[in-house]
Amino acid sequence: MVVGGGGEGDQKRSSGEMMAMASLFNDQQNPIQQFQVKFKEVETNFKTWLSKQSIPVEAAVVSTMSGVQGAFIGGLMGTLSPEMPQAGVDPQAIASMKQAQALVGGPWVQARNFAAITGVNAGIASVMKRIRGKEDIESAVVAALGSGFAYSLVSQGLQGQPMNAITTAAGFAVFQGVFFKLGERFSKPSTEDPFFTRGRTMLVKLGLEKYEKNFKKGLLTDPTLPLLTDSALKDANIPPGPRLMILDHIQRDPEIKGKRK
């Protein structure tokens, strides 16, 4: 009985030391890495919350956020745009440049234009994605048509000719369609392995996402997480510090720990 009690005490002491070392290792993480992990966590939680809202609410939130970003970019571009030279320039060239400058406008005008383009585009794209359940060229073209009309409306007002608005919207749609197709052609679709979803989430939360390849090479799939041991992680070539953090996280996570029983 005494021997059994001593063994149990040693096991608890060893577990406590492991948790303390994991906590110390976690505290010594790079602050930039910690910020990135927290940012990803907040972003994931926000996207999860947004996906549960109604279509009008999601469209309003996405349009507002994208519009603010567009206004900032447009204002910055308007502020940094070079001044028009006056001396030694042909008068006809100056007149043409003045017309172009009047069309583009200063920081406030560009902020307004970019806010309309990005806000409407993002809002329509979110609605199309919720309705169609995917992001495709049709959704991109419809969103571009809407942003083209919005740009024409805010830049020319109700006095602009309808044909100009149609031409602008069509130009936006063609450009967006070509850009979407080029993106599809040159980018490789990232297919997430469903057997490593929980493990990937855990590694990102701990700031250890670079060891995802080790998990895949060692076939440490989601069903094996409750069974993980130090030797199994060592066989997957994961260093001692990250091993302690992973085991500590599994021990603290009630959902993973509960599957051991």
Curated annotation (Swiss-Prot):
Keywords: Chloroplast, Membrane, Plastid, Plastid inner membrane, Protein transport, Transmembrane, Transmembrane helix, Transport. The chain crosses the membrane at residues 59-77, 113-129, 139-155, 163-180. One of its GO terms (cellular component) is plastid. This is Chloroplastic import inner membrane translocase subunit HP30-1. Probable component of a protein-conducting channel made of HP30-1, HP30-2 and HP20 that mediates the import of transit sequence-less proteins into the chloroplastic inner membrane. Interacts with CEQORH. Pfam families: SAM_1, Tim17. The keyword Transport applies. Together with HP30-2 and HP20, triggers the import and insertion of transit sequence-less multi-pass transmembrane proteins (e.g. CEQORH) into the chloroplastic inner membrane. InterPro entries: SAM, SAM/pointed_sf, TIM22. It is found in: Plastid, Chloroplast inner membrane. PANTHER family: CHLOROPLASTIC IMPORT INNER MEMBRANE TRANSLOCASE SUBUNIT HP30-1, MITOCHONDRIAL IMPORT INNER MEMBRANE TRANSLOCASE SUBUNIT TIM22. Belongs to the Tim17/Tim22/Tim23 family. Disruption phenotype: Plants lacking both HP30-1 and HP30-2 are yellow to pale-green and impaired import of CEQORH in chloroplast inner membranes. One of its GO terms (biological process) is mitochondrion organization. The keyword Transport applies. It is a multi-pass membrane protein. The lineage of its organism: Eukaryota, Viridiplantae, Streptophyta, Embryophyta, Tracheophyta.
